[in-house]
Structure formats: C-alpha cells, structure tokens
Amino acid sequence: MKSLSLTWITAVAVVLYLVQRYVRSYWRLKDIPGPVLAKLTDLQRVWWVKTGRAHEFHRDMHAMYGPIVRFGPNMVSVSDPRVIPTIYPSRPGFPKGDFYRTQKPYTRNKGAMPAVFNTQDEDLHKQLRSPIASLYSMTNVVRLEPLVDETLTVLSKQLDERFVGTNDKPFDLGDWLQYFAFDSMGTLTFSRRYGFLEQGRDMHGILQEIWNFMTRVAVMGQIPWFDEIWNKNSFITLFKRPTGFGVLKVVDNFISQRVSSRENDEKADEKDMLSQFLDIQASNPHSIMPWAPRAWTFSNVMAGSDSTANVMRTMMYNLLVDRDTLRSLRAELLEAENSNGLSRSLPSWDGVRSLPYLDACVLEALRLHPPFCLPFERVVPEGGITVCETYLPAGTVVGISPYLANRDKQTFGDDADKWRPSRWLDLSREDRVKLENSILTFGAGRRTCLGKNIAILEIKKLFPMLLLNYEIEIVNPENYQTTNAWFFRQWGLQAVIRKLPAPERDDTIEQKASIPPALNIPPSSSTVEVRIIDSGTLLDLRPDLFWTPDLPGLLKVTAPTYCFLISNGTRHVLFDLAVRQDWENLPPSIVAMIKSQTVIQEPRNISDVLDSDESSLGVRSKDIEAIIWSHAHFDHIGDPSTFPPSTELVVGPGIRDTHWPGFPTNPDAINLNTDIQGRNVREISFEKTQKGATKIGSFDAVDYFGDGSFYLLDAAGHSVGHIGALARVTTSPVSFVFMGGDSCHHAGVLRPTKYLPCPLDSGDTSLPCKSDSVFTLSPALPTDYTAALRTVENIKELDACEDVFVVLAHDATLKGKVDFYPSKINDWKAKEYGKKTKWLFYKDIENSIEGQK
C-alpha cells in the first residue's frame, strides 16, 4: 500500500512539474503571437519540418502574425533583417541553441563530436575557429586556385565526353554541379578528388549520407532532447547506424592515410587544407585538442560542398529560365574575354572577381535560395533583449530564417521573391552595404560561415567557364523542385548542352598584354655556356596523354629529345641524358609501356655524342662533373653507367626513396640498379634553409654553382622530383635559357597568355582566345596534377620575359631554327630566336585543321 502511494505521489509530482513548466513557458511569452499549438508544444515545429516545406509555413505565419512569431513554447522566430545585429552580434553572449547540438556526428566509441559550426560552447568555438580562420581568408583561398582549376578541367572534359554531341539528350545538370562542388572541396582539402566527376555518381554514398544526416537533424533539432535518447545513446546505436557515421568514416580514412604517409617520411605531403590542419595541431599540442583536425575536416566535407552546390543550382536554374539575364551575363563575360583576356578554359580569379553582373548574379542566388532555411537559433542572454518592440526574457530561443530575411520586401522590394540580379547594380555604397548586411545566407556576427570565400571562388570561376564554352538549355523546368530539410535542396535540373564555337578573332584590335610579375633573379656577373644536344632520338607521342583538348587531325606528334651541356669554365654538367641506346634493357614494365604507347627512333647514348664530337670544343664524357636528371623517366635518364664513377648524379626531391633500389632488386622499379651503382647520388632540397636556396619568379630555386650562373628550379608535378633549370648566358644585356624538362610537351600549353597575347599574324583565326593558351595540361600523366598546373603557370611568367628563352625537352619547332651542339646558344637574344620561334607551334594547329578538312 505504501509502495502504491509512493508511485501515485511520484506520478502526480511529475505531472505537476510538467504542467507548471508548460504554464510558466506559455506565460513568459504569452504576449508573442503565434499558432495556439505552437505555444504549447514543439510538435507543431516538427510537423512543419517533416513536410519539407517548413520555410513556406514560416513565411505564412509571419504574414499572418507579423515580424515576430512564437514557433514553440520557448522558441520565437523573427523575420526582420534589421535586427540581425541584435540577435547575431560580433561580441560573445548569444550562444547557439540546442538545435545545433543535434548536428554533432556521433560514434559509440568517441561520442558526439563538436565542430566549428555545431558547438554551443563559445570558448570551445573560439578554440576551434581561431587557429584555422586565416586559412579561409580570401588571400589564402586564392593560393589554392590551381586546385579549383584542376577540377574545372575535369568537369569540362566529362561534359564534352558524356553529354556534348548526344543529340540533345537531357541530363541532370544539378547533379554535375554538385559533383563539381564536392570534388573541388575534396581537392582543396585532400589534394584528391572524391571521384564524383570521373565516375558521374555519388562516391562512397557521401551525398546520400549527408542528406540523410540533415533530414534527421532537421526534425531532431525541433525536439533536441529526443536526439540524446534516440541518436546519441550508446545502447540504441547497437541496433541502428549512428548519425554522421558515413561521413566520419571518409574523414577518418583520409586522415589516417595522411598521418601514415607522414610517419613513413613520404615526401609527397601536399600543402592542402588537411596538411595545414595537421600542422596547426602539431605545432600547438597543448592548446589545440588532438581531435581538432578531425572536426575541421568533417566541417569541410559536410558543410563545405552541399551548400555551395545549392547556390550553383539556384544560379543556373534562374539563368536558364530567365534568358535575358543569361544573355546579360554572357555579354559581360565576352567583353572581359575580348578586352582583358579572360580565359575560357580556366577563368582566373583576377579576371572574374570584379565583374559587376557576375557579382550581382551570385549575390541574387545567395539571397533567393540560401542553403539553410530554418531559423539560426540563439539563446537570449541574461538581462533579456528587445526586438521588434517586444521583450524576450533570458533563456528564450530566438532565431531568424535566412529564407525570410533574404526575402524581406521592405528591404529588397515588392519583387523580393523574384530573380532580379539588377537589384544589386547602380547602388550607392551605403545602399549596397545595407542589402549585403540584410542577407543571412552565411550567418552573421561571430558565427559567420568560414567557407564563404571558397564558395565565392568556385562559383565565380565555374559560371564563366560554362557560359563561355557551352550553350545550355533547361528541359521541363516545371520538374525543378525544392525540399527543405535544414539543407534547402533542389531536384530535377534537367538540361541539354552543346559546345559553343570558338570566337572569331577581331584582327583589327591589338590585344593589350598584362605586365608579368617580376622574376627578381639575383644579380650576378657570372655566366655559363649552354648547348642544346639533339640526341637524335625521336618519340611518337599521343597528344591526349599530354594536353587537352584533342584536335581532330593531330593524332600523333613526333618529338625530339633534347638534353643540355652546361659549362662553367672547366666545370661541365649535363641536364638530362635522353633515351639510352639499349632501351630494350630497361625494366620489363618500362619496355612494355614503351612498346604500347610510343615508337623510339634512332636512340644514341649522350656519352657517345660527346666522345665522337670532332669540333674544337673537346668536352668528353670523362669531363662531366655531374649528370642532372630533370626527372627519372626513361626518355631523360639515359645510361649513366656509360660515364665514369666520378660523375655525380644529381636528382630532385624524393627521387632516391621513390626509385631505388632499382631493377632487378625491385621487380616493380622503373629504373635500374646500374644507374647509380658505384656513383654518388645527390638529392637537391629546395628548403629555405639550404645553402644557395633562393626564389626565381614563383619558383623555389637553388644556385647550383654558387655564383648566380645556373639555378635548379622546383618544377614539381609531372613526376616525383621533377626539376627545371635556368642558365644565365649573357650579362650585357642580361639573358637566360630556361630548360623545362617535361613540365609540358607542347608550347600551346604555355601560350598565349595574358602576359603574352598572340600577335595578329600568328596563325589560324579559329584559336580560342588571344590571351588563352591553346591547350591545357592533360591530367593523364602527372603524378601531382595540381602541382603540374602550378608549374605551368610559373613557366608562363618566365616565358613572358623577353630576357628568357624557354626550351622544352620535346619541342620539335626548334629543329632547324636554332643552333645545336656543338654550337652554344648564348647569343639567342642577338639572333632573335625567341621572336622567331615563339609562335611556330601554331603549325601543329594549322596542320590539324587542314588534316580535318
């Protein structure tokens, strides 16, 4: 009997507690209007979110009740963007509500993981955000632009191969925009794409995993207490998959691979965002938690891609539906191309950052369809606040939905629900700032989105590339739909795509060249003699392996193989050795590759070339102090064993560990043991602390002889340890010869550029642009495509300097046009070799076009 009485007393006490809690909650906000059910329970909010149309219900509630509406017993929604600074101040004191607690990914072993965007603890937020904030500044983000260029190149290639020329077969363009956004962020974060673009599908189920995660947290965020029971309970997760598990698995795999490569002292550690995350934590182990890199990386994967794809789809849909705005944007891009040399294939940030109509379209897309469309909830601090002439006591959860703020008619006009980019044009500075500050898309105050600059960079580079190269038409626009599950996702952006013809050049207009960056080569009175040795070996190259796009008719290029004799007084070195005469004795895997991909004609050992020279030069193989490999591929390494053991072998970073032991000790090796047997091998380091380290243009460099006459340059990307060389050949006037190795295999990859636009009489008028290189480096062969692209850009700066003669290892246009060994090339400038040979590569283009005819 006593037990029964105790049970009843307990039950009554619980009921009374709940009743007083509801009454107190109802009473403290009783003057704030809203639906009756919402004042009593959060189930009203749950139902709105479950429909996938919560933003529409929120809009209707505010239309009915005004700018401040009660959405729950302790939750108030505000729609007036003028109070954004009040609710989202720059000072601490307005922590995020429990809605964000539900967005912490959970695993049974490690529990719930806070991240920059989901933590409520303001001190922890500062600890997580402050160390990495500078990485997301536009200054740092722009340094990663080549990584975005890499992904743009892959996207263009996939569109061409899959959808162009398919008789207007529709495809889901929205999916491909998302693939681009994810692979861009993957490259920025890991130096590796996830593979969405190459495979044309959701890799590892990441997209579905993120959508499932957001769908769950959207509902749980309305009743966060239940999330602790259902999603973050170690017992229940024995029987169900934890939230965010799939994304965390991808993150953990990437991190473990990177940590493992570092522990093994592998040299190919990229300076991508993951490496920077790990470096930051390692340099501050006492102040930064060991799990911080995991949290930072999770944020990049989870929030850094889907939200950007959302804006891309919004902008693309509205441009395709409103063709007038599409024409206006394309006209601006064409003007930038014609006047400022904007590249079609890889529009640069400098070329697109300040285009007014492009900027207006991006802002309008951000305004009209923000990626997150539920209120950004904050907890009112002690003392309460007054918003919209209404007092909110401490502890009240208050928030503004970006969807409502961004469409406020008092701020943006009666057509706030319409796509109209022109609303952003011809504004005073004051009015422009007012509109920008009224957009809540990236948040406001202390918790603004870190990834904003990355998103803007990707979008402003993507759309010029698409609109200058393709004609895109929407198919069945009525099938375009949206769903709001915290993420505001779009579906059904079906389109057809056609390649636009290359623009006709206006030969009456001289293209104005931009001034290239200063090379800042250290002054010196020392020079070397440079002789180009044509080894006599010819290689048949497949163009698609080395550059894009393919040109019909240009199916094969027969290329020479050059190496260089560098003489500093009585000291002589060779830069590369071409192909060894007995190439059939190379490792079997290399021989098989050669037989399947190329044809070698008339190979000669460079030692024989030197020893059989009948000129008065008199430099023999025994006189060679060192052989310098630009890299370790078969067509550059020759046969070092034909030189005396006293000849040193000099190689780039990482070659020693990557290539030896050689064959046959290592049956998979691509080099032979005899290449280094009995010989000193010196590996060049470009670390700033090394003796002779310097900077040449954008290249890290080493002064080889120590007198400023000859530099080795870190020309990474094509292969491990790839290097170039720069020789000072005259001092009055000063001139240099740059030896590019295999940085690229066709001068059309280097030219034209904004620094070096093609002259009016340089070739066929169907070329893409006067200041846009004819070809882009193919991603097929480089071991590090991003670094390879960066190297090409660095060479373009050298190539634009009238004092530098750029020689590529396989440039057939030089044969018969310049002096070869045993003559030296030091007088190239006096003989105007640069001017005479710079545009000869256009002959390949003309032959290709003629062959197509």
Curated annotation (Swiss-Prot):
Cytoplasmic-side positions: 30-853
GO biological process, one term: terpenoid biosynthetic process
Superkingdom: Eukaryota
Record keywords, A-Z: Endoplasmic reticulum, Heme, Iron, Membrane, Metal-binding, Monooxygenase, Oxidoreductase, Transmembrane, Transmembrane helix
Enzyme nomenclature, EC number: 1.-.-.-
Gene3D superfamilies: Cytochrome P450, Ribonuclease Z/Hydroxyacylglutathione hydrolase-like
Cellular compartments per GO CC: endoplasmic reticulum membrane
Protein topology in the membrane: Single-pass membrane protein
InterPro entries per UniProt: Cyt_P450, Cyt_P450_CS, Cyt_P450_E_grp-IV, Cyt_P450_sf, Cytochrome_P450_monoxygenase, Metallo-B-lactamas, RibonucZ/Hydroxyglut_hydro
Its job: Cytochrome P450 monooxygenase; part of the gene cluster that mediates the biosynthesis of mycophenolic acid (MPA), the first isolated antibiotic natural product in the world obtained from a culture of Penicillium brevicompactum in 1893. MpaDE is an endoplasmic reticulum-bound enzyme that catalyzes the conversion of 5-methylorsellinic acid (5MOA) into the phthalide compound 5,7-dihydroxy-4,6-dimethylphthalide (DHMP).
Protein name: Cytochrome P450 monooxygenase mpaDE
Species this protein is from: Penicillium brevicompactum
